[in-house]
A protein has these predicted regions:
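Early extracytoplasmic/lumenal segment of secretory-pathway proteins
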Residues: 1-73
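Structural recognition of the beta-strand scaffold that forms the well-ordered cores
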Residues: 3-6, 33-36, 62-65, 114, ...
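Extracytoplasmic/periplasmic solute-binding protein
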Residues: 5-6, 107-113, 120, 144-178
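A structural signal for short loop-to-beta-strand junctions that line the ligand-binding cleft
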Residues: 52-66, 76, 80-126
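Flexible hinge/capping segments at coil-to-helix
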Residues: 129-145
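Ligand-binding pocket segment of bilobal, Venus flytrap-like solute-binding proteins
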Residues: 151-152, 159-217
């Protein structure tokens, strides 16, 4: 039995894992148990506790669907097996033109295999908006023209964090410092355009930027 700790909030993904379990059982006699979690940080905490207790074999977690923040935490705490990715039969099918060698700017070093591709996509109704903003600068102008309409999910919700990451990348023209470990010396300078933008945006955002949606719905 393989215990796979993964977010359980998508019915489509849950259905896929149930299908994968049936395939594994019929072809290899292996049972895949989907351990549904709300936040993968729960699994990070569990692994740290098991390691501290000296439980180096027979633990409760075999595989984990992990995000960049928790990948870095697990890597720093030496909780990950590997490197292993080049031993995977499917590795040759992975599109190496994608940034599979880093996660949230943290080098993966073969300790993490791609599970999917996450992209921030803005969707609009062409019947009501036929000329949508094509940049964050245009989005700010749109928000000022139509106040109290736009917002973003409150970080650390994934889409809210992704919104801010994409914003700071555009505003700084992908400053090289953003791909390095953060330090106090350049943080204020590099991120200044972000805070200036948000100060302007929040003035005209939904509920004046005092409240934020909890998710994307």
């Amino acid at each position: 039995t393989v215990y796979f700790h993964a977010w359980g909030g998508s019915q489509e993904i849950n259905n896929y894992l149930r299908w994968a379990d049936k395939q594994l059982q019929s072809q290899y006699g292996v049972t895949l148990k989907h351990v549904k979690v709300t936040d993968i940080a729960e699994t990070t905490t569990r692994l740290i506790a098991e390691k501290a207790a000296g439980k180096n074999t027979g633990g409760s977690v075999d595989m984990v669907w992990i995000n960049g923040e928790n990948f870095k935490s697990m890597k720093n705490n030496q909780l990950l097996f590997g490197p292993f990715v080049e031993r995977l039969p499917s590795w040759q099918q992975v599109d190496k033109s994608l940034p599979v060698d880093s996660d949230f700017s943290e080098p993966t070093e073969g300790l993490e295999a791609p599970w999917g591709v996450g992209q921030l996509v803005f969707i609009h109704d062409k019947m009501t908006l036929n000329n949508p903003p094509a940049s964050y600068a245009e989005m700010l102008s749109y928000a000022k023209a139509f106040p109290n309409k736009l917002s973003y999910p409150r970080p650390p919700e994934f889409h809210g964090t992704s919104f801010l990451k994409a914003l700071v990348l555009e505003l700084t023209n992908r400053d090289a410092a953003l791909y390095q470990p953060v330090n106090d010396e350049n943080f204020a300078v590099v991120t200044a355009p972000l805070w200036d933008y948000l100060d302007e945006f929040h003035k005209v955002a939904w509920r004046n930027g005092q409240q934020f949606p909890a998710g994307t719905a």
